């Protein structure tokens, strides 16, 4: 808190009616925490500025297209902030803008990447089992996916990219007792990298 306060968050105010949006992946409660710091330093700003959270949903290398065409989840500090953010994003986003509150929007981003992590962990764990059982995991997954309601991902050496390997920790750190599956998935995917390295040796 002191470190954030030293950066003068209250000084971000320019004029009444300004909108401030957080897009970075953040723990649940970040938007509210930032608002408390700002209004703690500058109480006269309360109800005069708008604060919202809208997680980015873009793929590197295709940023402009996805920025325009992807659906967005927008959650304000209050209903007025949500509407203000909707009005801003509607100027350039052609996808659907889904309204919610800031805590749900924050959790939505963490859920998206944690869901991918869990799905990848299942495929990776399956590959470990198949290695022990003498079964071709690629053939197995291909056959299992013939079922109309089964869609197993392909196993690999953990997970790719930066976000998926990091974002689940925002959930497990704040809700350790309730996030055992998410935590186990992280362990499996981390272990798979070392397992693959040993196989190469």
Regions found by a protein language model. Give the residues of each.
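Structural detector of well-ordered beta-strand residues that form the stable sheet scaffold
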Residues: 21, 51-52, 182
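Single conserved hydrophobic/aromatic residue that forms the stacking wall/gate
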Residues: 1-13
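Hydrophobic alpha-helical scaffolding
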Residues: 24, 75-78, 112, 116, ...
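Conserved Rossmann-fold NAD(P)-dependent oxidoreductase catalytic core, especially the SDR/UDP-sugar
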Residues: 17-32
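Generic recognition of short, well-ordered alpha-helical segments
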Residues: 32-33, 166
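NAD(P)-dependent Rossmann-like dehydrogenase/reductase catalytic/cofactor-binding core
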Residues: 83, 120, 131-201
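Internal alpha-helical scaffold of NAD(P)-dependent oxidoreductase catalytic cores
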Residues: 36-54, 58-150, 178
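A short helix->loop->beta-strand "cap" motif at the edges of active sites that frequently abuts
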Residues: 15-19, 46-47
């Amino acid at each position: 808190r002191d470190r954030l306060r030293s950066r003068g968050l209250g000084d971000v105010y320019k004029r009444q009616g300004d909108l401030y949006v957080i897009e970075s992946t953040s723990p649940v409660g970040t938007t509210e925490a930032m608002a408390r710091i700002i209004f703690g330093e500058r109480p006269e700003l309360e109800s005069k500025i708008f604060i919202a959270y809208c997680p980015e949903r873009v793929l590197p290398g295709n940023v402009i297209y996805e920025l325009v065409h992807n659906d967005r989840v927008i959650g304000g500090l209050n209903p007025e902030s949500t509407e203000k953010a909707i009005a801003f994003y509607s100027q350039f986003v052609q996808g659907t803008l889904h309204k919610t509150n800031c805590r749900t929007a924050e959790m939505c981003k963490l859920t998206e990447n944690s869901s991918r992590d869990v799905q990848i962990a299942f495929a990776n764990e399956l590959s470990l089992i198949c290695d022990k059982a003498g079964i071709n995991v690629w053939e197995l997954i291909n056959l299992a996916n013939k079922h109309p309601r089964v869609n197993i991902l392909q196993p690999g050496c953990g997970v790719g990219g930066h976000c998926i390997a990091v974002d689940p920790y925002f959930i497990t750190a704040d809700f350790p007792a309730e996030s055992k599956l998410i935590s186990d998935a992280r362990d499996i995917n981390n272990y798979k990298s070392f397992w693959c390295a040993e196989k190469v040796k």
